[in-house]
């Protein structure tokens, strides 16, 4: 068999197949995840590949029907039980969708300056004035954020 004939046969098998793994290709994502990839690989290398076909709906046998009759056991019912069964049920109320709890907003202090517009040096000066301690972190952004948080807590 020539290589082109094998490729054509594999192409036809893949087009008719319901499984990606019939024609094994180690570079394809589906083949890497497939449970039977070793079997497909062996079949593809030996070109002993069966040609699967999709089942038509009329070819599939209908499932056997189960008997609908059930054995019933006789129960002794009292008058109270009969009243409970015949009493009208209360209307079911639909649960109201719960609204998400709102985040609590921190009370805004009118004396609080706008920290976003301040430079890092200005923040450091303000921290020294208000006796606020802060820690230097590896990232200047984190250091700035922590300094601003400490300053807000001091107001």
UniProtKB/Swiss-Prot annotation:
One of its GO terms (biological process) is DNA replication. Keywords: DNA replication, Transcription, Transcription regulation. Disulfide bonds: none annotated. Signal peptide: none annotated. Residues 55-68, 78-95 have a biased composition (Basic and acidic residues). It comes from the Viruses. Residues 41-114 are annotated as: Disordered. Required for late gene transcription and DNA replication. This is Gene 27 protein. It comes from Bacillus phage SP01.
